[in-house]
Amino acid sequence: MIVMDQIAAMQALMRQYRREGKTIGFVPTMGYLHEGHTSLIDRARAENDIVVLSVFVNPLQFGPNEDFARYPRDFERDRRIAEQHGVDVLFHPEADEMYPEPLTVRAIVQARADVLCGRSRPGHFDGVATVLMKLFNIVMPDRAYFGMKDAQQVAVVDGLIRDLNFPIELVPVPTVREADGLAKSSRNVYLSPQERSEAPALYAALQAAASAVERGERSAAAIRRMVREHIEAHTHAEIDYVEVCSYPDLTPLETLAGTVLIAVAVRFASARLIDNIMIELPKTGEQGDGKGEQACFARS
């Protein structure tokens, strides 16, 4: 495995791979790798000649009162995990390599960024889009891999790739969960034992909502109320949002139809957790297949 920390050298290596006709799969991360990240790496390994992993805690996507300074970091551990999973190139730049001076140009995400997490984290997705534009230009991948735990980020990246004509295939990968249903996250290390015992209630609430949809519930208000009541009954967390929206455009829904995202975010004392579930339903006005409107769960 090659470890790189300089942009110019990284670009030269990527050009060499391209001259050799090799396909490049890219997994951008902020490090502190877990099974969610390794599922992305493994998928990239299966589909590409070269797998590139970036580990960079991007300061642009953290707000002034967020956890940039204490975000978990352990590069040697990340290096070992990357090598074990067959990463070819590990790109680990410092902040002053990525941002040597104040930016004169940065991304502003016009759509899909002012709802869900974007409502309480203004500028977050602008920072995500800015660093991804830089990383895409550095790595020049054929495919980029993102986890569906952050479905809003995947939607934003989808728009970024399409609107700016990056010749990159976006590959969404299903959420990886603990045995009790909690979505894998680097921020789970912040949870106290009590909070950790309560956190699986997020996915349980989403599953209960999905079951209600499967039984025929189509009211977004009813689904939101059901999820909120379950979380309030089983945790001490403060609910940031419970939303039901279309995907990938993230338009809030009143009646469930088409591709539906049910998404939640909560705040425990030291950790903000997100989760979601995706449901496929007939679009409004579509004829069924004679078997009724059975929900199809595309991603978990």
Swiss-Prot record:
It is found in: Cytoplasm. Its main location: cytoplasm. It is an enzyme of class 6 (ligase). Pathway: Cofactor biosynthesis; (R)-pantothenate biosynthesis; (R)-pantothenate from (R)-pantoate and beta-alanine: step 1/1. The reaction proceeds by a bi uni uni bi ping pong mechanism. Catalyzes the condensation of pantoate with beta-alanine in an ATP-dependent reaction via a pantoyl-adenylate intermediate. This is Pantothenate synthetase. It comes from Geobacillus kaustophilus (strain HTA426). The lineage of its organism: Bacteria, Bacillati, Bacillota, Bacilli, Bacillales.
